[in-house]
Amino acid sequence: MRVAGAAKLVVAVAVFLLTFYVISQVFEIKMDASLGNLFARSALDSAIRSTKPPRYKCGISKACPEKHFAFKMASGAANVVGPKICLEDNVLMSGVKNNVGRGINIALVNGKTGEVIDTKFFDMWGGDVAPFIEFLKTIQDGTVVLMATYDDGATKLTDEARRLIAELGSTSITSLGFRDNWVFCGGKGIKTKSPFEQHIKNNKETNKYEGWPEVVEMEGCIPQKQD
C-alpha cells in the first residue's frame, strides 16, 4: 500500500510539474509575441512620424532661409469669402479676424522686425479713392506692403493711385480691372519690380464663379531689411 501511495504521489508531482512547464512555455511565447507586437507598433509609429511632412510657417511649401519672412496670401473668392494674409505664422487679415472688406485689403509690416504697422481695407466699388491715396502716401521707406483684392478692387482706382502702387513694385496694377483677382507683396523704397505678384483677369469665358475669376494665391520668403 505504501509503495502504491508513493507511486501515486510521484505521478501527481510529475503531472503537476509537466503542466506547470507547459503553461509557463505558452505564457512565455505569448509574452514574447506581445512584446514583439508592441515593439513593431512603436517602430511603425516612429516611421509614420518620421515620414510626416514638416509644417512651415503660414503653411508654405518649404522653409524660408535665415533673415527672411515667410508669407502666404489669397485674394477673396467672389463676394463671399474674404482674402487672407499671413506673415510669419501670424494671420494679419482674414474673414475670421473680421478685418477685411470689399476693395483692396492692405497690411503694412516693418521690413526689419516683421511687426505689423497697420491693416486696412478700402472700398474701390462704392467708396472714395481719396483716403486710399492719402494712406499710400504715408507709407514709410522700409515698409513691406501686402495687398489683396476682394469682390472689386479696381473701379474707383485713379491714375494717381495706380502710380503709387506701381512705385511699391507692382507691375499688374496698371492693368487691374473690374472684379479681377490680385495679390501683391512689395515695399516702399523698392528699387526694382517685385517678384511677388499674381493677377487673374475677370473673364466670363474662364471665370470659376459667376461673375468672378478663381481665387489667386501666393506664398514666398521676403528678405528682411538690413541696416
UniProtKB/Swiss-Prot annotation:
Keyword Disulfide bond assigned: yes
UniProt keyword DNA-binding, yes or no: no
GO biological process, alphabetically ordered: epidermal cell differentiation; ERK1 and ERK2 cascade; gene expression; inflammatory response; keratinocyte proliferation; neutrophil differentiation; phosphatidylinositol 3-kinase/protein kinase B signal transduction
Induction data: By TGF-beta in epithelial cells.
GO molecular function, one term: carbohydrate binding
Tissue expression as described in the entry: Ubiquitously expressed, with highest levels in the retina. Up-regulated in mammary epithelial cells and hepatocytes undergoing epithelial to mesenchymal transition (at protein level).
Keyword set, alphabetical order: Cytoplasmic vesicle, Developmental protein, Disulfide bond, Lectin, Oncogene, Secreted, Signal
Residue intervals of the GG-type lectin domain: 67-225
Disulfide bonds: 58-86, 64-221
GO CC annotation: cytoplasmic vesicle; extracellular region; Golgi apparatus
Signal peptide start-end: 1-24
Pfam family, one: ILEI
CDD domains: ILEI_FAM3C
Superkingdom assignment: Eukaryota
Family per record: Belongs to the FAM3 family.
Known function: May be involved in retinal laminar formation. Promotes epithelial to mesenchymal transition.
Protein name: Protein FAM3C
Lineage start: Eukaryota, Metazoa, Chordata, Craniata, Vertebrata
